UniProtKB/Swiss-Prot annotation:
GO biological process terms, semicolon-separated: lipid homeostasis; mitochondrion organization
InterPro entries: ABC1_dom (IPR004147), ADCK1_dom (IPR045307), Kinase-like_dom_sf (IPR011009), Mito_struct-func_regulator (IPR051130)
Domain of life where this protein originates: Eukaryota
Taxonomy of the source species: Eukaryota, Fungi, Dikarya, Ascomycota, Saccharomycotina
UniProt-recorded name of the protein: ABC1 family protein MCP2
Chief site of localization: mitochondrion
Mitochondrial matrix topological segments: 19-34
Length: 569
């Protein structure tokens, strides 16, 4: 209980008493004045923190900002230290160096994982991409990042409710008949809840409600700045490994992904386009019901992860058929003019569900569900055509001179950088890529050579130099290729990668054929002798390629499914 003596000693009581009596206020010693100043400041801060919302929010923001900066700084410093130590140390033999580097990879990957999880948001997205780069990064890094695909930090129900009140002016309870407080999926930028909308019939329809993490609004500018700073520091300490381009790409794409109205537009456009290709793709894109900048309401479509082999096998779904549909989906996006490319097809953004074969699913017994349409890119027609010609030169013509010519055209590289780019595009070793030996599955030995060899000599610095030169839209095409290649490997397709390469070659051949038709129509009068001859020649070349591909596909199927005893006899 506060006593009268206590109140009489408060500064304002002392001042009031001396004014009333006319006596002068005695001078305090410097030490006493300093104590009073510090105490007064602390007391004022406590009062403001508890009773002034603006001051409270400022202090809280400063504390959280300091924490995020500290997490990034500490993780970066520790990784720098461990790698500097491991790379500069002398080893008795190559095996000892390899073991030491593997330990360093694992240690730094765990440090990074902890930092990414601690800060969440765009850091999770960085970790997801690291986890998908199996063709490039050591196994210790990619395996460590796998949990980030669908085990991300979630926002509380109270935070989501505040988001609805702030953005829509209504609470969750007022808008929905039912709302599951536990999200069915949590990603780096948002989480999804199952709910039932209030309908006029009083029953309610099941929907998926995608809610952006509220904290992103406050910290995205800071996080973008921090990641750019980290990459710039890497550039200072490791000038041979330029990574500032990654920070630039993150800054240019993250704000697009955070606008859910743009995602709704991409989803509806893609859903409408692929409705014509159900037989080839079995693709299902949830219909958008309502969209806002930070809230997206869609039809609810359930499913399992695409790499859930137990679910696939138990429902009688063909792995090779799923792999083929995946290949059709993303090659259609990459090679068809004016069609957007989904640039984030990692395991958490794809699902598979068992259905009854019908016309609206292409008579498949499954559907591939594609989520998260926030980031799409539209490469120029020239880029798509050069990219198609590169693959035809590799897979069909087996002509390294042509490969180099087209790679320089779409990737802005030098002759010396071509071998490494070929390996990066194909996800194979340099020898395999340049010897046209990429249609067979990667062996464990090849993957080990690629992962461990990346730190030998100047290979890693050369690769980073290439990535810093490549146009951003081409980088996103390569990223999409990386992620779909990783998914295909997870499916353990019994037909191997040969089938997916055959499908891609069909799209490449059609792209080149369409380009020649366009050129012929612009150069010659329609129905002239020359026009008809050029079109006939172009059609014959195209049909010959397609028929060869069909024959290879048949042979592949025959070798896989016809009993070996028949083949031997």
């Amino acid at each position: 209980m506060m006593t009268k003596a206590f109140f009489n000693k408060l500064p304002f009581e002392v001042f009031r008493r001396y004014v009333r009596t006319g006596k002068s206020i005695p001078q305090r010693s410097p030490r006493t004045r300093k104590s009073l100043l510090v105490g007064g400041t602390i007391a004022s801060a406590v009062v403001l923190y508890n009773f002034n919302d603006t001051f409270h929010d400022s202090v809280k923001h400063t504390a959280l900002t300091t924490k995020r900066i500290a997490v990034v700084t500490q993780a970066t410093t520790r990784c720098f230290y461990h790698y500097k130590r491991a790379l500069n140390k002398s080893y008795e033999n190559k095996k000892e160096r390899e073991v030491a580097l593997n330990k360093c990879h694992k240690m730094c990957a765990l440090i990074t994982l902890h930092a990414l999880r601690s800060n969440g948001g765009i850091y999770i997205k960085l970790g997801q991409h690291i986890g998908a780069m199996t063709y490039l990064l050591p196994k210790e890094w990619t395996d460590t990042m796998i949990p980030l695909q669908d085990h991300c930090p979630e926002s509380t129900y109270e935070e989501i409710d505040e988001l609805f009140k702030e953005d829509l002016g209504t609470s969750i309870e007022d808008m929905f008949l039912e709302f599951n407080k536990t999200p069915i999926g949590v990603a780096s930028l948002a989480q999804v809840h199952v709910a039932k909308l209030k309908n006029s019939d009083g029953k309610g329809s099941s929907v998926a409600v995608k809610c952006q993490h509220p904290s992103l609004k406050e910290f995205i500018p800071l996080d973008v700045m921090l990641t750019r700073t980290v990459f710039e520091l890497l550039d200072v300490f490791f000038p041979d490994y330029p990574l500032t381009w990654l920070g630039d790409e993150l800054q240019s794409s993250i704000y697009v992904e955070l606008n859910f109205t743009k995602e709704a537009e991409n989803a509806e456009k893609t859903r409408h386009y692929f409705s014509k290709f159900k037989k080839q793709t079995a693709l299902k894109i949830p219909k958008v019901i309502e969209s806002h900048k930070r809230i997206l309401i869609m039809e609810y479509v359930g499913g399992k992860r695409l790499d859930d082999l137990e679910y696939i096998d138990s429902h009688g779904i063909s792995r090779s058929e799923v792999s083929s549909c995946l290949s059709h989906i993303f090659n259609n996006m990459i090679f068809t003019p004016n069609v957007g490319i989904h640039c984030d097809p990692h395991g958490g953004n794809l699902a598979i569900r068992s259905v009854k074969p019908a016309k609206d699913n292409g008579y498949h017994n499954f559907e591939i569900v594609l989520f998260d349409h926030g980031l799409y890119r539209y490469p120029s027609t020239r880029t798509r055509r050069l990219y198609a010609k590169f693959w035809l030169s590799l897979l069909f013509d087996k002509d390294q001179t042509k490969m180099k010519k087209y790679a320089k055209g779409f990737a802005n590289i030098t002759d010396e950088q071509f071998p490494l780019l070929a390996a990066a595009i194909t996800g194979r070793s340099i020898d395999a890529a340049l010897n046209y030996d990429i249609s067979t599955s990667r062996t464990q030995e090849e993957m080990d050579v690629m992962a461990n060899g990346i730190l030998e000599g100047t290979l890693l610095s050369d690769l980073m130099s290439i990535l810093s030169r490549i146009p951003r839209v081409v980088l996103l095409i390569l990223k999409t290729n990386d992620l779909t290649r990783h998914l295909d490997e997870c499916l353990q397709n019994p037909l191997g990668p040969e089938r997916t390469f055959l499908i891609m070659t069909q799209y490449c051949a059609k792209t080149v054929y369409d380009e020649k038709v366009e050129r012929i129509n612009s150069e010659y009068a329609r129905w002239s002798i020359k026009w008809m001859w050029e079109n006939l020649t172009n059609w014959i070349v195209y049909e010959r390629r397609i028929n060869q591909l069909y024959f290879y596909d048949f042979v592949l199927w025959w070798k896989k499914f016809i009993p070996k005893t028949w083949l031997s006899s």
